[in-house]
Amino acid sequence: MGVPLIQQYRVARYVLEQKLRGRRRYPLVLMLEPLFRCNLACAGCGKIDYPDEILDKRLSVEECMAAIDDCGAPIVSIAGGEPLIHKEMPQIVQGFIERGKFVYLCTNALLLDRRMKDYRPSPYLTFSIHLDGTRQRHDASVCREGVFDTCVAVIEKARAQGFRVTANCTLFQGETAPEVAEFMDIAMALGVEGVTISPGYSYERAPRQDVFLKRRASKQLFRDLFKLGKSRRGKRQWYFNQSPLYLDFLAGNQAYECTPWGNPTRNVFGWQKPCYLLVGEGYAKTYRELMEETEWERYGTGRNPKCNDCMVHCGYEATAVNDAFRSPLKALRVMLAGPRTDGDMAPEPAIVYREEPLPRPHLVGKGSGTVATIAAPVSRHRKASG
């Protein structure tokens, strides 16, 4: 189980090619949001708080193909919104597969049962099922009862039909290591390939702001979880759909800075600056403009107040992959022994900004209606001097 060898090989070859060409910045995963419309309203989601004019927008098949052709990443993660609402999603997925890209189709599973017939099992296609814990925890997270049971049934059906399936789990405040361990046991029993797991990012537009983990609490939770995992002799092994060094970072053992260009985001507004998570920083018209004109040094923990508690894989997985190429023996040790679960944690990045009041992104009215345009002020923070 875990990431298939063919995918590991293709990604490793791609990274090596970029390094041999001397490229400092290159993408690993294209984050594609072809729509923001969703059939759930999760408490911790900051992606769907838009008027109908925006929720009704879609990226076309041609726009999606142009995005992957422009950036060239070996992996595409299709998010949203709920991607299965998009009527052209089968053609979009097939277009990526024909280009030899590994596709993770993220879904809450509510539509997958009846849409599964539109797809064929392939080593290049994975259904990434949103599953935020055990039944009680997940249903509370998505604000609807019965969704967990739907996910379980759909996972079993997809696995029976030969599809690759992973679970995508976001952890929030109040969760305990034993509770997460119980979820991991459930996920492994369902036969998923692995679990993508990370602390939730505190979206400014999320309906609830009291559910997000702080950075220190996140690290301790993962240490406690991995400690439980190491004590499970004779029980089913846990598989994560992430690199060993990223998991080691979650446990507080690596002092990583984020690599936002590793997961560039294309959505209905354009190429989102600087990453998948930050809303309100503006958009580039082209991938080249995103890479060349984004002020990357303004972002990251210690560099921007919006980034301070972020430990999400879309920012740090690329950092971990690069570190594995620089320090293969370290990566091998962590892969064999697992993340360290005691001792001092790695130091946090120094704060190099002075925080100033930051207005929330807002919708701009025009005439009698609301236009489909988001005001996107640049973060108002300055580097500290001296």
What are these regions (language model features)?
Residues 1, 59-60, 99, 128-132, ...:
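Radical SAM enzyme [4Fe-4S]-AdoMet core and its adjacent flexible, acidic
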Residues 37, 41, 257, 306-309:
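The −1 position to Zn-ligating cysteines in a subset of zinc-ribbon hairpins
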Residues 115, 137-140:
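Short, charged, surface-exposed secondary-structure boundary motifs
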Residues 48, 79, 130, 198, ...:
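Conserved residues at the C-terminal ends of beta-strands
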Residues 44-45, 49-52, 265, 282, ...:
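Cys/His-rich zinc-coordinating "finger/knuckle" motifs
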Residues 2-118, 122-123, 323, 337:
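Conserved alpha-helical substructure of the radical SAM core
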Residues 272-386:
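Flexible mid-to-C-terminal extensions adjoining Fe-S/redox cofactors in radical SAM and related proteins
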Residues 28-33, 242-246, 290-301:
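Short, intrinsically disordered, charge-biased short linear motifs at domain edges
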